[in-house]
A protein has these predicted regions:
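Hydrophobic/basic alpha-helical segments
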Residues: 1-286
Length: 286
């Protein structure tokens, strides 16, 4: 549930009483938030409040049949299939397809606008404009795309390819891979791993808040018998998870991307140097 940038999460089973209890807790929490805002001369924007259930399709169908709503102030909030969280569109199944489609559509619109003035500006300025209006949108919140199939993020890769063609003045039939290498651009799936590894590096060097570092555990902190060989390394433990959507969580995807890096990268303490070497590493994989 979202009210501007405030978020409330409640777990529930499919039991009717549990669902009723979850809705009541949401109502009580929003009432407390509204009262807190009012006491400080702030007003909770009820019209922007959104409600969504997240889970497997079969469970979501059963929840939808219960027809539950949540009351926030004088507004009745009904569940939506897609909600927006700080610019990231989250669908009930967390497939991220709507977010990818919306981002790709916005980026292509910006590219069409830039193409109209491409003949008036040079390559350097065009590159800066593409970074500002296109690549920044591809990279925003891209850690939520971790673990997705390449087919899902393919629209974003097509955006990047089109941006490279615009900068290099290539035709639609020209091969784009040499242009991407010349621009030193990582493919979209590597850009996602780059973000994950940057966050893991901040955890490893103690430069991140506790709410992020508490989600992962270093192997050396609590080595198991099977992990004694790697207890003296910078590896992080992956939690046991048997579902594809669970493996997309940062607690799993972060250590997975970090542990796959060469050990030489783990030893770099400086953030800027780490990012430079990390990009070089991913470019070498293309």
């Amino acid at each position: 549930m979202y009210a501007d940038d405030k978020q409330i999460y409640v777990d529930t089973t499919l039991d009717k009483d549990d669902v009723n209890n979850a809705c009541q807790r949401l109502h009580d929490c929003t009432a407390d938030v509204s009262a807190w805002c009012a006491s400080r001369r702030l007003q909770l924007n009820e019209t922007k409040t959104e409600l969504a259930w997240f889970g497997k399709p079969s469970r979501l169908e059963k929840l939808a049949a219960m027809n539950h709503t949540v009351t926030v102030g004088s507004s009745v909030i009904e569940p939506k299939d897609v909600v927006r969280d700080l610019g990231v569109m989250l669908d009930s199944g967390l497939s991220m397809k709507q977010h990818v489609a919306k981002t790709a559509s916005t980026c292509f619109y910006q590219l069409r606008r830039l193409r109209q003035v491409r003949h008036l500006v040079g390559q350097e300025l065009t590159t800066q404009l593409v970074h500002a209006f296109v690549l920044s949108r591809i990279d925003y919140g891209n850690s939520t795309l971790a673990g997705l199939p390449k087919s899902t993020i393919a629209p974003l890769q097509r955006v990047q390819n089109a941006a490279a063609r615009l900068i290099m003045n290539l035709r639609i039939r020209d091969h784009v891979t040499p242009a991407l290498r010349q621009l030193h651009w990582l493919p979209v799936h590597h850009r996602v791993n780059f973000k994950l590894c940057t966050m893991m590096h901040a955890i490893h060097t103690g430069q991140c808040p506790a709410y992020l570092s508490d989600t992962v555990q270093a192997v050396a902190d609590n080595p198991t018998r099977a992990g004694l060989r790697s207890a003296d390394t910078a590896a992080y433990r992956k939690p046991k998870c048997n579902t594809a959507i669970g493996q997309r969580a940062f607690s799993f995807a972060g250590p997975l991307a970090w542990n796959a890096l060469p050990s030489a990268l783990h030893d770099i303490a400086d953030r800027r140097q780490f990012r430079k070497r990390l990009k070089t590493h991913y470019l070498s994989l293309n």
